Amino acid sequence: MMDILMYLFETYIQSDVELLVDQDELSDELSRAGFHQDDIYKALNWLEKLAALQETETIPYMNNSAITSIRVYIPQEMARMDVTCRGFLTYLEQIHVLSADTREMVIDRVMELETSDFVLDDLKWIILMVLFNAPGNENAYTQMEELLYGAEDGYIH
């Protein structure tokens, strides 16, 4: 599913291609590109849920978090995101690329992925997708894009 999400992000979203593409047409194109129908459906559903996160004004689990609060990960989140991924999220919060809200959106989207081999590079792409879709995060998106395409290890020194 990550391959499809990255393909869609690079092909349609990042390249400013007209986004008024029919879902059936898009599904057919992805099938012709070699992706399996089940994975296509899951990826498109994942993107719809990402869009829904942007449309809701209040998401209950994101309310009332103080700036000084520390995120405690549940066992399922720790199983999906290793210590490197969790450390990277903390790092991005410290340099103000992610806010508590965008961090929670990222974690929500990561947990919706059906993968057993989630790695830091996958996380970086998810973060980029969330920031691109979250209004008012243009500067954070630019910083994340520089991290993704710039530094090899992803950390600014």
Curated annotation (Swiss-Prot):
Pfam family, one: DUF494
Coiled coil ranges: none
Family membership noted in the UniProt record: Belongs to the Smg family.
Protein known as: Protein Smg homolog
Gene giving rise to this polypeptide: smg
